[in-house]
Amino acid sequence: MEQIDKQKIADAVKVILEAVGENPDREGLIDTPMRVARMYEEVFAGLKKDPSVHFDTIFEEQHEELVLVKDIRFSSMCEHHLVPFFGVAHVAYLPQNGRVAGLSKLARVVDDVSRRPQLQERITTTVAEIMMDKLKPLGVMVIMEAEHMCMTIRGVNKPGTKTITSAVRGAFKNDDKLRSEVLALIKHN
């Protein structure tokens, strides 16, 4: 993986601190620029990753009924304001021809797609499209719920507001009963 330019980020953070009237050399802020650079390296780690590789290994298992991994915690950075948004993803698919993925792979794909400057809508769609392309299932349904700091700490200032997005593909798109089953299982503890 190509490394990010941490020094360039640290220099930019120092400029931002000066621009808002802070002294970046004072105690408490002296190490902040490099801390922010290391944080960006971590939260943007998905930029240099291909999330689809998690589905390079597929298992042949004669299971052709619903698979749901719910409450996958994720965090990302709003590409409009560079502030976090975070929540849970629920990923369901209907295997075809016995092709199933390791359960952890669904969470890894969500992580890799999320760890970059991003929009929730794009994460939702991208996860669904990768699964359709690599797993070749009968259908995929991805639902994401997140709180966006760009709505919580600025602008409309509405803490606790949740945004819910969905991507529905294949069998889930036209089968109300199948969609309802996923929604009921998500609500079920």
Curated annotation (Swiss-Prot):
Catalysed reactions, semicolon-separated: GTP + H2O = 7,8-dihydroneopterin 3'-triphosphate + formate + H(+)
Gene Ontology biological process terms, A to Z: one-carbon metabolic process; tetrahydrobiopterin biosynthetic process; tetrahydrofolate biosynthetic process
Alphabetical list of Pfam families matching this protein: GTP_cyclohydroI
Known EC number: 3.5.4.16
Taxonomic placement: Bacteria, Bacillati, Bacillota, Bacilli, Bacillales
InterPro entries: GTP-CH-I_C/QueF, GTP-CH-I_N, GTP_CycHdrlase_I, GTP_CycHdrlase_I_CS, GTP_CycHdrlase_I_dom
Any one GO molecular-function label of the UniProt entry: zinc ion binding
Keywords attached to this entry: GTP-binding, Hydrolase, Metal-binding, Nucleotide-binding, One-carbon metabolism, Zinc
Record protein name field: GTP cyclohydrolase 1
Family as reported in the entry's similarity comment: Belongs to the GTP cyclohydrolase I family.
GO cellular component, one term: cytoplasm
Organism (species): Listeria monocytogenes serotype 4a (strain HCC23)
SUBUNIT field: Homomer.
SUPFAM superfamilies cross-referenced by the UniProt entry: Tetrahydrobiopterin biosynthesis enzymes-like (SSF55620)
Uppermost EC category: hydrolase
Sites where the protein binds Zn(2+): C78, H81, C150
Gene field: folE
Pathway recorded for this protein: Cofactor biosynthesis; 7,8-dihydroneopterin triphosphate biosynthesis; 7,8-dihydroneopterin triphosphate from GTP: step 1/1
